[in-house]
């Protein structure tokens, strides 16, 4: 279950990729903007401030996240939709879409390469599609998670839940996919050298980060509190060795993959 408060503990670090992604979207005055995987709505509300005249739609599968989003949206600036992006129908909006944003979602959606062409088709000519996904599934934060899961008595249940890295392609794959369906494409990758917990307030800052994302599938399987505590303790200990605290905080490198595409005029 998604926990908005846990996820937002590192809001500044999580916001930066969104800002880098959307800075490359050149839409001037879009009429319809969709945020796929809007989460707690923090970034979606930024879109409403950037394009105040647009109809903004935030789509997410987590009722908990959408509840938080609605509470934050005191001005009713956004239409919040509870839906799975795999079954979400762009035609339900009744008009072509000008901008589709997907920030840090598609790693959870293994089928996204076959969904992207449909989203591009739903764009108005000249419309924009922008996506960002983590590319750090071979980093210690993830390899150690799989190692601890493999040693668990419930490895058979845990390991199948930890295959998100297989859903994420290398940057060139997204370039060829989007260029092949009639888009002008900008694809890049960045490794952020993140400094977590500079004030040394957390026992394990990388563990706190993963509790908001990567660790969630494990916690979904391990319902027993003792099982959870044992797993988290073993994983946390391994993380402290892989990411030792420095005098200025804990360095947590994080690779991310970006793709921004503009649908060429004259294509529908």
Roles of regions detected by a PLM:
Residues 113, 126-198:
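Conserved catalytic/acceptor-binding region of the Class I
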Residues 90-100:
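A short acidic, Gly/Pro-enriched loop at the edge of an enzyme's catalytic core
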Residues 109-110, 123-125:
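Helix-to-beta-strand junctions that scaffold the AdoMet/dcAdoMet cofactor pocket
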Residues 1-34, 42-46, 65-68, 72, ...:
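Conserved class I S-adenosyl-L-methionine
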């Amino acid at each position: 279950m998604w926990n908005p408060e846990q996820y937002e503990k590192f809001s500044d670090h999580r916001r930066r990729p969104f800002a880098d992604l959307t800075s490359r979207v050149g839409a001037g005055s879009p009429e319809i903007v969709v945020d796929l995987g809007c989460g707690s709505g923090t970034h979606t509300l930024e879109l409403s401030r950037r394009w105040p005249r647009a109809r903004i739609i935030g789509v997410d599968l987590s009722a908990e996240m959408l509840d938080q989003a609605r509470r934050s949206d005191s001005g009713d600036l956004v239409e919040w939709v509870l839906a799975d992006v795999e079954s979400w129908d762009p035609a339900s909006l009744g008009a072509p879409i000008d901008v589709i944003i997907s920030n840090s979602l598609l790693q959870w959606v293994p089928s996204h390469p076959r969904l992207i062409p449909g989203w591009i088709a739903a764009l108005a000519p000249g419309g924009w599609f922008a996506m960002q996904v983590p590319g750090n599934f071979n980093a210690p934060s993830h390899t150690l998670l799989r190692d601890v899961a493999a040693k668990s008595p419930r490895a058979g249940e845990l390991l199948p839940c930890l295959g998100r890295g297989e859903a994420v392609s290398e940057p060139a794959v997204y370039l060829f996919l989007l260029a092949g369906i009639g888009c002008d494409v900008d694809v890049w990758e960045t490794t952020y050298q993140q400094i977590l917990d500079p004030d040394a307030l957390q026992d394990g800052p990388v563990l706190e980060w993963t509790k908001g994302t990567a660790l969630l599938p494990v916690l979904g399987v391990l319902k027993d509190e003792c099982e959870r505590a044992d797993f988290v303790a073993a994983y946390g200990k391994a993380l402290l060795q892989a990411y030792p605290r420095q005098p200025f905080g804990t360095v947590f490198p994080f690779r991310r993959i970006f793709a921004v595409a503009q649908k060429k005029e004259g294509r529908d």
